[in-house]
């Protein structure tokens, strides 16, 4: 099965998993999704993740979701740039998500990183998603 937008599929699986109060969700493996998960783990939005393979050899990422007082830690996660409409921004024009309470995840020439790190390094890129 080929996905036209694996990032949107990943974000939807996270949202649906948290809406159903699931402890874990499985997402198809890709380099970009793994980079986003590294960022979410470092920022404390998820408990952790591991790489697993099914018997057919397909790689999946097992994501352990995080809750606080029986409520999901991720309040809102939205896809910004999509295949039909890419959204790029320079370092000085990178917006703030929820007035700085949330973060944007940006794909830059130096890899996938958070918006405030991209501003600090002075590099722009494609705004992948916002997390609050």
Swiss-Prot record:
Keywords linked to the UniProt accession: Ribonucleoprotein, Ribosomal protein, RNA-binding, rRNA-binding
Highest taxon of source: Bacteria
Annotated GO biological processes are:
translation
A Pfam family hit: Ribosomal_S8
- Report the InterPro entries cross-referenced here: Ribosomal_uS8, Ribosomal_uS8_CS, Ribosomal_uS8_sf
**Looking at the keywords, is Ribosomal protein present?**
yes
One GO MF annotation is: structural constituent of ribosome
Would the keyword Ribonucleoprotein be found if you checked this record's keyword annotation?
Answer: yes
The record describes its quaternary structure and partners as: Part of the 30S ribosomal subunit. Contacts proteins S5 and S12.
Q: What family is this?
A: Belongs to the universal ribosomal protein uS8 family.
Q: Which PANTHER family match?
A: 40S RIBOSOMAL PROTEIN S15A
Question: NCBIfam families given for it?
Answer: PRK00136.1 (NF001109)
| Role played | One of the primary rRNA binding proteins, it binds directly to 16S rRNA central domain where it helps coordinate assembly of the platform of the 30S subunit.
Kindly provide the name given to this protein in its UniProt entry. Small ribosomal subunit protein uS8
Q: Which organism is it from?
A: Anaplasma marginale (strain Florida)
């Amino acid at each position: 099965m080929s996905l036209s937008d694996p990032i949107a599929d990943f974000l939807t699986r996270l949202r649906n998993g948290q809406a159903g109060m699931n402890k874990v969700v499985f997402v198809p493996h890709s380099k970009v999704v793994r980079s986003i998960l590294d960022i979410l783990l470092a920022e404390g939005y998820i408990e952790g993740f591991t790489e697993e393979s099914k018997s057919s050899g397909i790689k999946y990422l097992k994501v352990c979701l995080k809750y606080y007082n029986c409520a999901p830690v991720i309040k809102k996660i939205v896809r910004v740039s999509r295949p039909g409409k890419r959204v790029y921004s320079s370092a000085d024009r990178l917006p703030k998500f929820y007035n700085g309470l949330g973060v944007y995840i940006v794909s830059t020439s130096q890899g996938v990183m958070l918006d405030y790190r991209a501003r600090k390094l002075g590099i722009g890129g494609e705004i992948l998603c916002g997390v609050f």
